[in-house]
Every structure is written in structure tokens, then in C-alpha cells.
């Protein structure tokens, strides 16, 4: 099977949330079989920033669902959305 690179947007529940702590919690919650690549912060509006995460997963059935489910349960996370996917080379 090939690897798939996914760009995932994680929205914090508040503009006041400590994003460094949230990124540490997200990294700790990466499920088995998922390779964490990087985080970037993206300004949204009124001081709110999204965490853009890049991960690599197998192209098996379910794909990014384990990551989405695990990260949705992290305290301080409002939403988790896959922005883009593509094959890794």
C-alpha cells in the first residue's frame, strides 16, 4: 500500500487557548499507524488561529478517520477537518 499525506485543520475552542499546549496534546494523541509531519499556525479572524497539521497515513480503508476521531477528543479542540490529501512520493 502507498502512503497518503493529509493536511488537517484543527480549530481550537477559543482564541485564548494556549496553542503550544494544544499542539503537544495533539502530537501525543497521534494514533498508531499515523506519522506526524508538522504543525503550522494559520490566522483565521479576530486573533483566532487554526492549527494546520500534516500527517502521513496508509491508503487503507478509513484513511484519516483514526486521526480525526482521536484529535476530536482532545480537550480544547472545537473541530477537525481534512483540508487536502495526496499520495506521498
Swiss-Prot record:
<comment type="similarity">
    <text>Belongs to the EF-1-beta/EF-1-delta family.</text>
</comment>
<keyword id="KW-0251">Elongation factor</keyword>
<dbReference type="InterPro" id="IPR036219">
    <property type="entry name" value="eEF-1beta-like_sf"/>
</dbReference>
<dbReference type="InterPro" id="IPR014038">
    <property type="entry name" value="EF1B_bsu/dsu_GNE"/>
</dbReference>
<dbReference type="InterPro" id="IPR004542">
    <property type="entry name" value="Transl_elong_EF1B_B_arc"/>
</dbReference>
<dbReference type="GO" id="GO:0003746">
    <property type="term" value="F:translation elongation factor activity"/>
</dbReference>
<comment type="function">
    <text>Promotes the exchange of GDP for GTP in EF-1-alpha/GDP, thus allowing the regeneration of EF-1-alpha/GTP that could then be used to form the ternary complex EF-1-alpha/GTP/AAtRNA.</text>
</comment>
<dbReference type="Pfam" id="PF00736">
    <property type="entry name" value="EF1_GNE"/>
</dbReference>
<protein>
    <recommendedName>
        <fullName>Elongation factor 1-beta</fullName>
    </recommendedName>
</protein>
<keyword id="KW-0648">Protein biosynthesis</keyword>
<dbReference type="InterPro" id="IPR014717">
    <property type="entry name" value="Transl_elong_EF1B/ribsomal_bS6"/>
</dbReference>
